[in-house]
Structures are given as C-alpha cells and as structure tokens.
C-alpha cells in the first residue's frame, strides 16, 4: 500500500506538468532534474538509464539543446492515471515540434511512468515510445521546415544521418 494520499500525488503531478511547461518555454532544461530525488533513476529506452540528478540533468540538457529535442516546444499530457496503491503516475505525453512554417502539427507520443517518492519529488521516470514512429515524424517535420526556410542549422547533420538521400 502506498503511504501517500491521493491529493499529494495529484499535487506532485500538477507541479511536474507546470514545471515542464515552464521549461518548454524558458528552455532552462537543467531545472528538470530538480523534479526528482537526489538518487532518482531515469530510464529512457533509446538513450539509456541515468542515476541521480547530476546524470539526469546532464542528459536532459544535452538532449533538449540539440536537434531534434531543441525543436520540441510542448509536452502536454493527453491523459493520465494515478495508481494510488503504488504511488505511480502513468501518462501519455505529446512531444510536439515547433511550427515548421505551414502551421502543421508534428508530434509523437510516449508513455511516461513516474514513481512518486514524497515531498513533491519523483524517485524515477521511465519513458516508453516507438522509435520506428518517432524518426519518420521528425524527418517529415524537417522536410516541411526546410521547405519553409525554418530548419535549424543544427538539424542538417541529423537529417544526413537519419534521412538517407536528403540533400537540404
């Protein structure tokens, strides 16, 4: 049985969402690690497992300041479920790219599992997604952005690697 009341879990997840929303605007990704306990674990299936705030901070800053993370502008949850018995929050997060110039929306979701530790902090986060869908979404976004003169300069090397035949 979870020792945390439902209201505390709700408040912690609301704070998580608010902080991520603020970070998406400010681009101060180093703040993200402060949502976790000092010994937290972050599992990201494509990038690996990160132990502790320092590793989480280093990874998130590096990931979100280089393409394609640097072109993601919003991460709202589509839905969420709170498992009171375990103290978990499970949600679907929309990873939304910036407007590529034609107002089209390019996004790919992931499932996030947050394990609550108390005092407003999470002990772990695990992100689960399908890279076979994520990569084509980013490629499609980049093609549209390039056609509208809005492809960031740091995206060219990524496109050369993940979009064979691209000659932007």
Map each language-model feature to its residues:
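Short, cysteine-centered beta-strand-loop-beta hairpins and adjacent loop/turn segments enriched
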Residues: 65-70, 96-107
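A short, structured loop/turn motif at beta-sheet edges
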Residues: 80-87, 115-123
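Low-complexity, intrinsically disordered terminal/linker segments enriched in charged
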Residues: 126-168
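A short, polar/proline- and glycine-enriched secondary-structure boundary/capping micro-motif
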Residues: 53-54, 101-104, 133-141
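A solvent-exposed, acidic/Ser-Thr-rich amphipathic alpha-helical stretch
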Residues: 29-89
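Hydrophobic alpha-helical core bundles mediating ligand binding, dimerization, or RNAP-core interactions
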Residues: 13-20, 36, 60-64, 91-95, ...
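Short, surface-exposed coil-to-beta transition loops
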Residues: 74-75, 105-112
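Short, low-complexity N-terminal intrinsically disordered segments enriched in polar/charged residues
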Residues: 1-34, 38, 155-168
């Amino acid at each position: 049985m979870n020792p945390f009341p439902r209201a505390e879990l709700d408040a912690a997840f609301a704070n998580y969402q608010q902080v991520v929303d603020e970070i998406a605007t400010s681009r101060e990704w180093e703040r993200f690690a402060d949502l976790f306990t000092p010994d937290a674990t972050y599992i990201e299936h494509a990038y690996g497992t990160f132990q502790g705030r320092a590793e989480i901070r280093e990874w998130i800053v590096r990931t979100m300041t280089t393409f394609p993370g640097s072109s993601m502008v919003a991460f709202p949850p589509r839905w969420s479920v709170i498992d009171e018995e375990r103290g978990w929050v499970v949600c679907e997060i929309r990873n939304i790219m910036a407007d590529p110039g034609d107002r089209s929306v390019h996004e790919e979701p992931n499932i996030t599992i947050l394990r609550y530790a108390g005092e407003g902090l999470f002990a772990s986060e695990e992100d689960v997604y399908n890279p076979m869908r994520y990569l084509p979404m980013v490629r499609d976004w980049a093609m549209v952005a390039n056609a509208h003169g809005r492809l960031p300069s740091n995206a060219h090397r990524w496109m050369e690697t993940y979009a064979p035949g691209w000659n932007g």
